[in-house]
Amino acid sequence: FIGGSDDSLNLVAFLEDQKKEEIPLSEIFAKIGLDKQNWDFRQTVEYLEFTHSDGVEMDFHFAIDVVTDLAAILLECSVSGSVNLQDLDEYNTPARRIRITVTPEEHDAMNKALADFAQNPLEYDLSEMMDNEEIQEMARDVEALRKELYEAAGRNRDYHVKAEDVKSLLPDWRGANGCIATNRIT
């Protein structure tokens, strides 16, 4: 279900059309209209759309569909550092790597939004387009995605760590100027 809808393909087209490697989540939300949802994706309240640089208007039917796809991309960025857009749509998208950047507050809100869908899938407008078994399966997939993204190895990831908080752990570090072998555990 994640990555398999018209909304998914339109999201890939949107990301490809941005023509940059690093895209802030807040910018994606603003350009598509997801920011008007105020992190509540149960009902798609506004018409979500963007106009492609070639002039074609592309719309999104279900806010939660786009959000779960973005979460899957965030997970890939977390694991690999970036995602190749061609891997998301091999037929229509050229090979190009992108990374979505997210603030700690956005991570917290995303975690809550995914958890809400996983716990209450029938409260979402998307459930009107799927039978009960399909929406429950998607809810299980979203919960697995959420856990992988935010509870890896059974620990909550802390996205609030600042560079200053880590400096005391490496008092002899002077800067990166090459690759060295070390016995230091990081």
Placement of each model-derived feature along the sequence:
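Low-complexity intrinsically disordered segments
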Residues: 110-177
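Structural motif
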Residues: 51-66
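Non-catalytic all-alpha helical scaffold/repeat segments
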Residues: 27-51, 115-122, 162-167, 172-173
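Structural recognition of alpha-solenoid helical scaffolds
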Residues: 10, 24, 37-43, 66, ...
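Amphipathic alpha-helical elements of HEAT/ARM-like alpha-solenoid repeat scaffolds that form extended
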Residues: 7-14, 67, 71-74, 146
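N-terminal leader/targeting peptides and immediately adjacent processing regions
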Residues: 1-41
